[in-house]
């Protein structure tokens, strides 16, 4: 998330003292991270739901096979995400 995306003018940023500028940068970084987590959660939900609940919903509760499939799907997604991050961190060092 850049300052331009938030319609923050550089002239406005220059009016801030160093402490406020640092706090604003941290806030923007936190918001970007939150946005990425929300997007990843949405993607995961959509992917696993499409895979595990392909038909119409007949009951207010998932049946056992759908529940198991969703749990496995989420676990595999998180495993792959963890391994990817571990690999990228290894490449960085």
Swiss-Prot record:
Pfam families: zf-Tim10_DDP. One of its GO terms (biological process) is protein transport. One of its GO terms (molecular function) is metal ion binding. The keyword Membrane applies. It is a peripheral membrane protein. SUPFAM superfamilies: Tim10-like (SSF144122). Signal peptide: none annotated. A motif (Twin CX3C motif) lies at residues 48-73. GO terms for cellular component: mitochondrial inner membrane. Keywords: Chaperone, Disulfide bond, Membrane, Metal-binding, Mitochondrion, Mitochondrion inner membrane, Protein transport, Translocation, Transport, Zinc. It is found in: Mitochondrion inner membrane. The keyword Mitochondrion applies. Its main location: mitochondrion. Disulfide bonds join 48-73, 52-69. Heterohexamer; composed of 3 copies of TIM8 and 3 copies of TIM13, named soluble 70 kDa complex. Associates with the TIM22 complex, whose core is composed of TIM22 and TIM54. Interacts with the transmembrane regions of multi-pass transmembrane proteins in transit. The twin CX3C motif contains 4 conserved Cys residues that form 2 disulfide bonds in the mitochondrial intermembrane space. However, during the transit of TIM8 from cytoplasm into mitochondrion, the Cys residues probably coordinate zinc, thereby preventing folding and allowing its transfer across mitochondrial outer membrane. Belongs to the small Tim family. Mitochondrial intermembrane chaperone that participates in the import and insertion of some multi-pass transmembrane proteins into the mitochondrial inner membrane. Also required for the transfer of beta-barrel precursors from the TOM complex to the sorting and assembly machinery (SAM complex) of the outer membrane. Acts as a chaperone-like protein that protects the hydrophobic precursors from aggregation and guide them through the mitochondrial intermembrane space. This is Mitochondrial import inner membrane translocase subunit TIM8. It comes from Gibberella zeae (strain ATCC MYA-4620 / CBS 123657 / FGSC 9075 / NRRL 31084 / PH-1) (Wheat head blight fungus). The gene is TIM8.
């Amino acid at each position: 998330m850049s300052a331009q995306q938030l319609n923050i003018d550089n002239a406005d940023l220059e009016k801030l003292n160093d402490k406020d500028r640092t706090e604003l940068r941290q806030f923007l970084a936190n918001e970007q991270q939150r946005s990425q987590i929300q997007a990843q959660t949405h993607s995961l939900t959509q992917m696993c739901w499409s895979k595990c609940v392909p038909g119409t919903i007949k009951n207010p509760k998932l049946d056992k096979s759908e529940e198991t499939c969703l749990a496995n799907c989420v676990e595999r997604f998180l495993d792959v995400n963890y391994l990817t991050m571990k690999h990228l961190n290894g490449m960085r060092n």
